[in-house]
Amino acid sequence: SRGWDAVILTGSDPHSSEYPSERWKQVQWLTGFTGECGDVVVTPDHAGLWTDTRYFIQATRQLSGTEVELHKMKVPGQVAIPEWLSSHFSKKPVRVAVDGLCQSVGDVETLEAALKKACGPDGFEIADIPDMLEQFWADRPAIPHSPVEPLDEKVVGETRKERISWLRAQLKAEGCDSMFVTALDEIAWLLNVRGKDIDYNPYVISYLLVTPQSVTWFVRNVDEVPQVPGVVAADYHVLDDAFEDRKAETGRLLVDPSTLNWHVSKLLHRHFPDLLLVRGTSPVIVRKAVKNKKEQEGFRRAFIEDGVALETFLYWIETSVKGGAQVTEWEASEKMSALRARIEGCRGDSFENISAYGANAALPHYSTPREGSAVIKPRGLYLIDTGGQFTFGTTDTTRTVPLGRCSKLEREDYTLALKGMVDLSLAVFPEGTAGCKYDDREGSGYAGSHRGDGDN
């Protein structure tokens, strides 16, 4: 009825988050697929999910009985979304609608370039329909708003003022005056604040505008946000007015197209001429990765204390199943989380635990079901992929352990994976070696087998 030939939905949010809140799990709501990587294309006669090797088995199971077809990515003969759209529609232009709030500028430009190549420069149109599912998703969750928790400099090793001053100096060195920050982890780092707006991630859903004169934090429920010294809180939904009000003090504005969503980008272009909009990689990314002494101490503490919880868990599960207890994968996952929760400063898990036994342990990114998960037996292999969020650090640890006698194939695969990991850990690479070369070396002992994951 709107003249669209196709709708493209992604599994991200307005901040290009890897883990979106429940409100923006559009792919899951539409298809039932719960994997972290997936794009959906809907046309008048077709619905398809594009995902990679990590989720082929999961997607096949979850899409069974639906009208959604699985399209496999990162395999020989793959047909990407733009090429598929071009071949599916004979008439041109192809009219494609996207939710501009959940598509980064970089993603839309990649789509435009691919469509231009597949359909010709005049063979397509892309429409921005922000929150397009709002009218159909009756019980759609609201944008979350959790309490904001400022972090003391004793925990992070730097004050908020020091980090903002560093950013302003960095912007000046790069020929810019201001920056519009959209990635939630970067905002949390710059302001030394934490929240619980997204499961497993201690973030506050917000935007941040840093100019030479002011720092404006666009958040939900402004009146409930505690005062943050040196920061002015503004409403999350009034970006348009704020850009106009601060135009005079902003000057040359740096934006990162990999995290800036397309819809907000168009708002910026409405208020700032192209000459004043500078595209580039956020300087916060690298600076945030270089840990100061206090942060290093925090990470070491996190892994030590979380390691004790993990060792306690592994002892518990081994003695429990060998003692005849009926322990399911889900129950084991809950036990691991409970042991971690005892640690002072724990903010919960850093991602959904992967608790997998037997054949399930071989599945890339297995999702442990609450109901009907496998019973763990005193034989074969058990995998636990788990991590925690603490006020002083974040952990992520994977362990595959034999719980008793293993099959010949299990012993061979376990040994080859271990040898590959040892080989990789001892190897010396020239500076600048691509990450895919590491994968080639680590998997060299697999005798031609293909695992399709990264959790060896």
Role assignments for model-derived ranges:
Residues 1-456:
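Active-site neighborhoods and metal-handling regions in enzymes and metal-associated proteins
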